[in-house]
Curated annotation (Swiss-Prot):
It comes from Aspergillus clavatus (strain ATCC 1007 / CBS 513.65 / DSM 816 / NCTC 3887 / NRRL 1 / QM 1276 / 107). It is found in: Cell membrane. PANTHER family: GLUCAN 1,3-BETA-GLUCOSIDASE, GLUCAN ENDO-1,3-BETA-GLUCOSIDASE BTGC. Residues 339-695 are extracellular. Its EC number is 3.2.1.39. Glycans are attached at N415, N438, N466, N642. One of its GO terms (biological process) is polysaccharide catabolic process. It is an enzyme of class 3 (hydrolase). Residues 1-317 are cytoplasmic. This is Probable glucan endo-1,3-beta-glucosidase btgC. Residues 36-45, 188-198 have a biased composition (Polar residues). Glucanases play a role in cell expansion during growth, in cell-cell fusion during mating, and in spore release during sporulation. This enzyme may be involved in beta-glucan degradation. Active on laminarin and lichenan. Belongs to the glycosyl hydrolase 17 family.
Length: 695
């Protein structure tokens, strides 16, 4: 989509941040979408109080890549990439870096369209810097500088999308049944303006500014109930399975609550989303695309949606359709409840054929035993010549680790073992998003059973507005680390994923709370003589000097796809954005810098920085196998050669995220290198980098 091109220049401020000024040039294309990479500024002047984080992000008019820059303030909107839910059932083939992310590069919930801009000052500059990109320079280590393209709109001209963690479901299907309890907490990461929230978006809103996380799947219905009036004050649960607070901006743009309960429930998630619009009246003129944080583990993490309100002339037809869909929903819920115990991602021709598709987690173990490296099924999975260990890290969230659903339908240890058997052929470094449902313990057990001596784990702690959830997560982290026989298997602990992004205009308060949690973890480790890096991950533009000071590692989510970046420029843009917004913040320190999420969808349409509003189907960032191959070709081996540290998002598709798809944006469930059954996608080629492997 064309639009005025903006040139930005930085003016160094006393606080170490850069201030951007810009000029509009009507002759150049502008990429106006929000990416999971964008983040929000703490400066109140850059953000409307009703917006959940969309703010202008200063960016300079770069002449070359990789050159030292002054720190860039983080004035972004929320995104979350990144995943962790297994609505498909405990026995589901665990190949899914479920959840948050896409969040994916910057984040976590994604949002586009009119809703993405709601609450902003109306200026195109109020967008994440990661969304746009400038012409490439000769300093880029990935690809030769291309000819002048006339200047692409900087990321500032892009609308932010919410990002997702790998544990976050991008679609309604991400929300498992049973997680209805609204979250509420006294201590939260920032308080958003609840008075401006639409009750349809979040009937039971959290007190905090952070939308629900990957662990919180929002659903309007439980596996046993149809829509009913619920008094959140009467619910005894801690609420981490409740609705994520939805703001009028990204977070508020939720579709109707939909929750697939089992493998067969993924499709039902889409139906639920449609029905929500019939059972509830809502005013938005356009449908917004934005997963709720908390529908998956990192879209927790994430999943309320908004459907257009039926016009008066179509009300009767709407009720008829609603009645029909209600019948389907009831069947889906009933089937989901049953499927929750049998959901299995297995496919007939997958290597895990020994596991019946109707098995529960315990049934899988009863039939196959506790899988290990000597199991025939595991040997087959670990002998895939098309997989190469060229990724420094992989974002991963096992299926079925959404609390409290996992209490009723426990995740499958064997599925985690199967996943790890595959992941071990891609990387020696796995990143988790949370500690609920024994997911960390299952990963450690799988590593032991498979004898993966080189495999390391980045522990994840999900932080959100619900203090009970955060407390449970942190306490479990302590238990895991304190009970570990050898902590050398841990590369570090990531406290929070895109917590600042989800805080919206309350980023300052959220950062204070986040750093408090980080310091608490640091103090605990010190007290127990545990030497382990402490970090947090957020949109690339959300990092600032204060956050860098308390973190041992700067971890940023960066997604070129949501910036509408053509794939032949994506690798260069990603590296440059990371260098100019994150790496530069660590100059003069010994802090490491890591891209915590980066990837490309294998299908579903194209994004021109403004969602699917492209003039044709070849403009902007195009999702596809060829494009995914191109991005890996330009990024993977070069990153391996120059030592760029990153986590790929992601290894496995997450089918439940289909609910987040729209008519022209059908990529939410297609970020994996493999399908849910752990089979490499047709035509996809993972670079072998001449035999070189990641450490």
């Amino acid at each position: 989509m064309s639009g005025p091109h903006r040139t930005f220049s930085f003016e160094q401020r006393g606080d170490g941040e850069a201030h951007s000024s810009f000029m509009d040039h009507a002759m150049h294309p502008q990429y106006d979408d929000v990416s999971p990479i964008s983040n929000m500024s703490s400066s109140p002047g850059h953000m409307n109080e009703t917006h959940h984080g969309l703010a202008s992000v200063p960016e300079d008019n770069h002449q070359g890549w990789g050159q030292a820059r002054g720190p860039s303030p983080s004035n972004r909107t929320g995104f979350t990439a990144t995943p962790e839910m297994d609505n498909l059932g405990p026995a589901s083939v665990g190949g899914g870096i479920s959840g948050i992310a896409l969040g994916v590069a910057n984040s976590h919930d994604r949002l586009s369209g009119v809703e993405a801009r709601r609450g902003t000052d109306g200026q195109e500059a109020n967008i994440p810097a990661e969304r746009g990109y400038n012409t490439t320079g000769s300093d880029n280590p990935y690809i030769p500088a291309p000819p002048d393209m006339g200047g692409y709109g900087s990321s500032e001209t892009l609308h932010p999308r919410q990002s997702y963690g790998s544990n976050v479901a991008l679609g309604a299907a991400a929300g498992p049944a049973g997680q209805l309890t609204p979250g509420h907490s006294a201590t939260h990461l920032g308080t958003s303006n609840s008075s401006q929230r639409n009750l349809y978006d979040a009937p039971y809103q959290s007190a905090g500014g952070l939308s629900a996380g990957p662990y919180q799947r929002h659903s309007a219905y439980s596996s046993n109930d149809l829509p009913l009036d619920i008094n959140p004050e009467e619910i005894a649960d801690d609420g981490d399975d409740g609705f994520a607070p939805a703001g009028n901006s990204r977070s508020s743009a939720r579709r109707s609550q939909a929750v697939p309960a089992a493998a067969g429930g993924a499709a039902a998630g889409g139906v639920l989303g449609g029905i929500g619009g019939l059972f509830n009246n809502r005013n938005p003129a356009e449908t917004s695309y934005d997963p709720v944080p908390g529908a998956g583990l990192e879209a927790g993490e994430k999943s309320q949606w908004v459907k257009p309100k039926p016009s008066t002339g179509s009300r009767k037809r709407g009720w008829i359709i609603g009645a029909i869909l209600a019948v389907i929903i009831i069947g889906a819920i009933v089937g989901g409840a049953v499927g929750g115990t049998i959901g299995h991602k297995d496919s007939g021709d997958s290597a895990s054929g020994s596991s019946a598709s109707t098995q529960s987690a315990s049934g899988d173990t009863d039939t196959n035993g506790d899988l290990d490296k000597n199991s025939a099924e595991i040997k087959a999975l670990m002998n895939n010549k098309d997989l190469h260990k060229v990724f420094p890290g992989m974002d991963y969230t096992p299926w079925g680790v959404q609390y409290p659903l996992c209490l009723k339908y426990p995740p499958s240890q064997n599925n985690v073992t199967r996943d790890m058997a595959v992941l071990a052929q891609l990387t020696n470094n796995v990143r988790l998003y949370g500690t609920d449902c024994n997911q960390t313990e299952m990963v450690l057990h799988a590593i032991d059973k498979l004898d993966l001596k080189d495999m390391k784990v980045w522990l994840g702690v999900w932080i959100d507005t619900n203090e009970t959830t955060s407390r449970r997560q942190i306490d479990q982290l302590y238990k895991i680390v304190d009970d570990a026989k050898d902590i050398s298997i841990f590369n570090g602990a990531i406290v929070g994923n895109e917590a600042l992004f989800r805080a919206g205009d309350n980023k300052i308060t959220a950062q204070a709370t986040l750093t408090k949690y980080m310091q608490e973890v640091r103090d605990h480790f010190k007290k127990h003589d545990i030497k382990m890096p402490i970090a947090t991950s957020d949109l690339g533009d959300n990092w600032n000097a204060e956050l860098v000071q308390i973190a041992d590692v700067v971890m940023s989510n960066v997604h070129p796809f949501f910036g509408g970046i053509p794939v032949d420029q994506a690798a260069a843009w990603t590296w440059r954005f990371w260098q100019d917004h994150d790496v530069i913040l660590t100059q003069g320190t010994d802090k490491r810098q890591v891209i915590s999420e980066v990837g490309w969808p294998s299908g579903g349409g194209n994004d021109c920085g403004k969602g699917a509003n492209c003039p044709d189907d070849t403009s902007g960032a195009v999702a596809g196998i060829d494009e995914l191959n191109k991005f890996m070709e330009d990024w993977v081996c070069q990153a391996l050669d120059n030592g760029t540290d990153y986590f790929w998002f992601e290894a496995f598709d997450e089918p439940w995220k289909i609910e987040f798809n729209t008519k022209n944006e059908n990529w939410e469930d297609k970020w994996g290198l493999m399908d849910p059954a752990r089979k490499l996608k047709s035509g996809l080629k993972i670079p072998d980098c001449g035999g070189k492997t990641a450490a």
